[in-house]
Amino acid sequence: MSSTTPKRSEPADEDMEVEVKRSKVETDPKSTQRKYEDFKAQMVTLANQLKIDLKVKHNADIIGSIVMAACTGNAIRETGKYSFFFNDEKDGWKLREVELNCKPVIDWANQTLTDEQKREWYPFLASLQLCVKTEDAILWQRNPVTRELQVSPVCEPFATGYNIKDKLKKSRPLSVGPLNHLLHWVNLQTEKSVGKGRKLSPRAAAGIRKRLEATLMRQTIGQSQKAMLRQIFDGKLAYVRTLAHSYCSIKPHIENQFVLPYSVIAVTDSFENADMSSEWVYKKLCEASKKILLTGPNESWKTFMAQMLIYCTFRCLHEDLGVLTSMFGMVFEPRKSKGKYCKSSELQVLGSQEITYKFWSKPQRGAPRNLGGARRGQICTRPSFRGVRATYNQYSSLEQLEKACGNPTSENVVEALNAEFEDTQNSPLKAQGRSTKGGLPMSTKATSRLQASFCLKFSLICVCNFCCFLSLLLGIC
């Protein structure tokens, strides 16, 4: 008989929110390596019980999500029923429901993730969950944040991370889109609940608001945008739409990390020298792609599901598709071309597809100031990779942006924003670091040639009709 393991004790809301402590800076170069190794070890422990093949992406995703749930204190059953693919000699790969004993992983998490260890583990787990939840955001395109804020879905690139746990959002606040923090702040104005009937005390609510306000001010780089934020904090919520749409041109600060998803972790033999920013990540993804058996509705989805590994690893779901095409040497398919995704029970094993890269770049960490959406391509992009690229600003004023989005400017207080829009538009190129070819850094001259070629390639590739604007919900088009 299955039983539910209670969640590990958490600090009181008031203490947790008012006295938020910074995550411990990891100075140990082996820290990321050990976390990958420990996480994989727990995946293997679960899979070995029933000889579940972790090369199958669906299997690895289910096992990985169980380990993640145990690590983050979710109430999961010690014995639960899950569906995995098993290879039958007669019928090939078939889904079969089995009972899995999760208690060993639950016990490991309870012993390992003490309050002290959470400060070291939660930033890693937050980055990992941001990575794997990217797939849900792409496949289902629910856009809950923009819908609740009542702004155009064109702003969804700045709501990234909406679907990860709140306790993990606090560990990587600058990696979560500012619209998430803004929605949380707005909701606190009318609702003091933290779920399941629990109410926040006034002191705890004030602590949360203060933390959210500080994060939003750090992520917002335009001075006029900051002034608008102060107006919102004073209760003038009519400015929310205007601020959200201004992010489409004056991009906010959203930090990115490169993280291996569950399916790549499962088939990686060595995590030596692991990090979240170098060519190591590219190499491990390419090596793993030869082993991973992709799953999807049918064979026509195979290339798209291979590209899904890229989207998740580099969190580049809102990146310019021309940039991705230049980097990985394959044409990236728009989400709208694939139609509706299927139920888990209708998945098929599609086999493997090798991923290669022509050059690599480090993750984008600062705010990409001079990067608008391509005028004839994606309505709005959010760069994930550092590098020089051309800018094709979609709009020359906030009024044009809001007119296209169907939202009138709340009040006539956007002159400063329009001036910043103009400054942004007048800068055709913006350096954000170096792109690197093959495996070794190149000379400045070689890098410049690559950057010029890089800009030309994606400028030519990103050509499609502007009238598809309303259908481009997530910028993956």
Curated annotation (Swiss-Prot):
Its main location: virion. The keyword Ribonucleoprotein applies. One of its GO terms (cellular component) is helical viral capsid. Disulfide bonds: none annotated. The keyword Ribonucleoprotein applies. It is found in: Virion. GO terms for biological process: symbiont entry into host cell; viral penetration into host nucleus. Residues 1-32 are annotated as: Disordered. Keywords: Capsid protein, Helical capsid protein, Ribonucleoprotein, Viral nucleoprotein, Viral penetration into host nucleus, Virion, Virus entry into host cell. It comes from the Viruses. Residues 18-32 have a biased composition (Basic and acidic residues). Belongs to the influenza viruses nucleoprotein family. This is Nucleoprotein. It comes from Dhori virus (strain Indian/1313/61).
